[in-house]
């Protein structure tokens, strides 16, 4: 009875090992009928009764996904870092030949109105704060050395102090 119990235990142990070891059931067509065969768990079916060892890394889809995400992140970060360190050159605009002429320090009496000049469109009249129409602020000089029109320089606001607050409020 002891030998019989040993044989049954060995048979059950063999069945247990065979059941716990995962196997792949593969098939392929040979003529019109399918042919079945079994591969081990770490092997892939190749088609004609052959089993090929599969790399376990091929089954790790999340590994490949994270690897591709890491590559894309590194490429994107490198692109933005490169753009910040080496900005693209600015588009060159055509150069304008503009020359300024200074007004004479002591103009002839009556040639210029008192008060700061107000710059307007070259084709339209200028208005001073009082409401009087004044001559064009831009004076065209046809004999300019650059061939273009020349205009007086803009007034320098930095050299004069701002008006007092009471005067600004009173003018409004």
Curated annotation (Swiss-Prot):
<keyword id="KW-0967">Endosome</keyword>
<dbReference type="GO" id="GO:0031090">
    <property type="term" value="C:organelle membrane"/>
</dbReference>
<feature type="signal peptide">
    <location>
        <begin position="1"/>
        <end position="22"/>
    </location>
</feature>
<keyword id="KW-0458">Lysosome</keyword>
<dbReference type="GO" id="GO:0031902">
    <property type="term" value="C:late endosome membrane"/>
</dbReference>
<dbReference type="InterPro" id="IPR026229">
    <property type="entry name" value="VOPP1"/>
</dbReference>
<protein>
    <recommendedName>
        <fullName>WW domain binding protein VOPP1</fullName>
    </recommendedName>
</protein>
<keyword id="KW-0732">Signal</keyword>
<keyword id="KW-0472">Membrane</keyword>
<feature type="transmembrane region" description="Helical">
    <location>
        <begin position="61"/>
        <end position="81"/>
    </location>
</feature>
<keyword id="KW-1133">Transmembrane helix</keyword>
<feature type="region of interest" description="Disordered">
    <location>
        <begin position="139"/>
        <end position="172"/>
    </location>
</feature>
<feature type="topological domain" description="Extracellular">
    <location>
        <begin position="23"/>
        <end position="60"/>
    </location>
</feature>
<feature type="compositionally biased region" description="Pro residues">
    <location>
        <begin position="151"/>
        <end position="165"/>
    </location>
</feature>
<keyword id="KW-0804">Transcription</keyword>
<keyword id="KW-0805">Transcription regulation</keyword>
<dbReference type="GO" id="GO:0030659">
    <property type="term" value="C:cytoplasmic vesicle membrane"/>
</dbReference>
<comment type="function">
    <text>Increases the transcriptional activity of NFKB1 by facilitating its nuclear translocation, DNA-binding and associated apoptotic response, when overexpressed. May sequester WWOX in lysosomal vesicles and thereby regulate WWOX role as tumor suppressor.</text>
</comment>
<dbReference type="GO" id="GO:0019899">
    <property type="term" value="F:enzyme binding"/>
</dbReference>
<keyword id="KW-0812">Transmembrane</keyword>
<comment type="subunit">
    <text>Interacts with WWOX (via WW domain).</text>
</comment>
<dbReference type="GO" id="GO:0005765">
    <property type="term" value="C:lysosomal membrane"/>
</dbReference>
<feature type="topological domain" description="Cytoplasmic">
    <location>
        <begin position="82"/>
        <end position="172"/>
    </location>
</feature>
<comment type="similarity">
    <text>Belongs to the VOPP1/ECOP family.</text>
</comment>
<keyword id="KW-0968">Cytoplasmic vesicle</keyword>
């Amino acid at each position: 009875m002891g030998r019989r119990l040993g044989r049954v235990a060995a048979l059950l142990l063999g069945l247990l090992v065979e059941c716990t070891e995962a196997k792949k059931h593969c098939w392929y067509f040979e003529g019109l009928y399918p042919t079945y065969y079994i591969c081990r768990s770490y092997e892939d079916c190749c088609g004609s009764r052959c089993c090929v060892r599969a790399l376990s890394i091929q089954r790790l889809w999340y590994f490949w996904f994270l690897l591709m995400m890491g590559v894309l992140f590194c490429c994107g970060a490198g692109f933005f870092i490169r753009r910040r360190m080496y900005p693209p050159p600015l588009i060159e605009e055509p150069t304008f030949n503009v020359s300024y002429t200074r007004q004479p320090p002591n103009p002839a009496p009556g040639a210029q109105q008192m008060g700061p000049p107000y710059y307007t469109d070259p084709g339209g009249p200028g208005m001073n704060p009082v409401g009087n129409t004044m001559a064009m602020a831009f004076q065209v000089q046809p004999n300019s050395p650059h061939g273009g029109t020349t205009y007086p320089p803009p007034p320098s606001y930095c050299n004069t102090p701002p008006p007092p607050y009471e005067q600004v409020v009173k003018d409004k």
